[in-house]
């Protein structure tokens, strides 16, 4: 029986004010000084990164900063996000009980606003007047443009040329919010190339510019800082699921690209050995085809975009182009804390193909009246398979990381819904 009462839920400030037992060392390494993470950046960026690190360590314990963050998260972004039991969807999951953590209902339509409000406030308190960001699906770009409009900061968003075409709606949203959107036409013209250009901008304009990194990757302190701003997802879900199901879940699942939404919901359950944590990465056309973004399934350790983690690379250490129908998962790397959790055996990472994700996308639309982001549909697809594996009555929490407004055209083409009248 679902408990309809509203439990007292934690605030964002509780997620960032105190260090955790899973924090990296002072050099940003998870799992020891020679472990995952670190800072693999040009010397020109070291002083800038140290400035960000010092500012974050100061502000994370500043009551003024924490109060501003809590106020904006509650009154502007709309936290807490609800936890919803998807009873009709559950009928397709071996009668497991599927609960959706509705990050799609946040302002701007995804979990990205959690991180961006924190970093934009930090940028302003550092005296920066200009914020840059990378984006794949456009959700981080929209959230960054939103926060910059709110706080009066100039905003430049770097986005791969392929992604600007397949996410044209989000490009328009960013421009409406006052951001400059730069379409990157080099390399694979996707997220990794957008990050490359953003780093170049940061090196050239560090005095007045803050780089608002969108995922739990990159050089220290970004993997930890982004995780801290996203931890609220799991902290809320942990309280909510015990109120509704009367116990902790059997499994918590999320899609994994760079990994911010996944680490955000996983973190609150890391010390619960009875809770399985499963991340679903983009297998594209199938791992065997080579057209995928399944970094853990087919990748290997290496340095990429400022940290040591897993990435898709050839035998010479050159990055291999990734592929996914989902722009937000079309990335050949992953955050270093995820690499540590994989090696420690705490989180299981599995591939989901484009076809499996789109089947789950359509099913969630029809069964629950919820149009998810295609990124999130990978997690839904994985949860459906895991439900059959775990059996009747198993409780599974899915991080529904974003809504699918941006993906309607892609979905309509996939399902053949754009025929002439």
From Swiss-Prot:
Enzyme Commission designation: 4.2.1.20
Keyword Amino-acid biosynthesis among record annotations: yes
Molecular function per GO: tryptophan synthase activity
Species of provenance: Mycobacterium tuberculosis (strain ATCC 25618 / H37Rv)
Record GO cellular component, one term: cytoplasm
Cofactor: pyridoxal 5'-phosphate
One Gene Ontology biological process: L-tryptophan biosynthetic process
Subunit architecture: Tetramer of two alpha and two beta chains.
Known function: The beta subunit is responsible for the synthesis of L-tryptophan from indole and L-serine.
Substrates-to-products reaction catalysed: (1S,2R)-1-C-(indol-3-yl)glycerol 3-phosphate + L-serine = D-glyceraldehyde 3-phosphate + L-tryptophan + H2O
Domain of life according to the entry: Bacteria
The family this protein is said to belong to: Belongs to the TrpB family.
UniProtKB keywords: Amino-acid biosynthesis, Aromatic amino acid biosynthesis, Lyase, Pyridoxal phosphate, Tryptophan biosynthesis
N6-(pyridoxal phosphate)lysine modification, residue list: 112
Pfam families given in the database record: PALP (PF00291)
Pathway this chain belongs to: Amino-acid biosynthesis; L-tryptophan biosynthesis; L-tryptophan from chorismate: step 5/5
Protein name (record): Tryptophan synthase beta chain
């Amino acid at each position: 029986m679902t408990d309809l009462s509203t439990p007292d839920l934690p605030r964002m400030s509780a997620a960032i004010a105190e260090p955790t037992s899973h924090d990296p060392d002072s050099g940003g390494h998870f799992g020891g000084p020679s472990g995952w993470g670190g800072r693999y950046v040009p010397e020109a960026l070291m002083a800038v990164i140290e400035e960000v690190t010092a500012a974050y360590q100061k502000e994370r314990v500043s009551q003024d900063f924490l109060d501003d963050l809590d106020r904006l998260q509650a009154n502007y972004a709309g936290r807490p996000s609800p936890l919803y039991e998807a009873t009709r969807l559950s009928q397709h999951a071996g009668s497991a009980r599927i609960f959706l953590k509705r990050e799609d209902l946040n302002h701007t339509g995804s979990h990205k606003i959690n991180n961006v409000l924190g970093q934009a406030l930090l940028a302003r308190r550092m005296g920066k007047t200009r914020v840059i960001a990378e984006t794949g699906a456009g959700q981080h770009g929209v959230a960054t443009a939103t926060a910059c409009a709110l706080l009066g900061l100039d905003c430049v968003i770097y986005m791969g040329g392929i992604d600007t075409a397949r996410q044209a709606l989000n490009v328009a949203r960013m421009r409406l919010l006052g951001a400059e959107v730069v379409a990157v036409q080099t390399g694979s013209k996707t997220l990794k190339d957008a990050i490359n250009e953003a780093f170049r901008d940061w090196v050239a304009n560090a005095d007045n510019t803050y780089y608002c990194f969108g995922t739990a990757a990159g050089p220290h302190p970004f993997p930890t800082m982004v995780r801290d701003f996203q931890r609220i997802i799991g902290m809320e879900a942990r309280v909510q699921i015990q109120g509704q199901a009367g116990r902790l879940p059997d499994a918590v699942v999320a899609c994994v690209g760079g990994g911010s939404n996944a680490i955000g919901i996983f973190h609150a359950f890391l010390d619960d050995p009875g809770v399985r944590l499963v991340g679903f990465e983009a297998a594209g056309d199938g791992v065997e085809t080579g057209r995928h973004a399944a970094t853990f399934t087919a990748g290997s350790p290496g340095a990429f975009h400022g940290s040591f983690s897993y990435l898709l690379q050839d035998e010479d250490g050159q990055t291999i182009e990734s592929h996914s129908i989902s722009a937000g998962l079309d990335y050949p790397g992953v955050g270093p804390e995820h690499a540590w959790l994989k090696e420690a055996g705490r989180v299981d990472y599995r591939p989901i193909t484009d076809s499996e994700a789109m089947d789950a996308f359509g099913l969630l639309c029809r069964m629950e009246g919820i149009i998810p982001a295609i990124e999130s549909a990978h997690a839904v697809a994985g949860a459906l398979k895991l439900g059959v594996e775990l059996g009747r009555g198993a409780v599974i929490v899915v991080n529904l990381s974003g809504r699918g407004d941006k993906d309607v055209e892609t979905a309509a083409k996939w399902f053949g819904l754009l025929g002439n009248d």
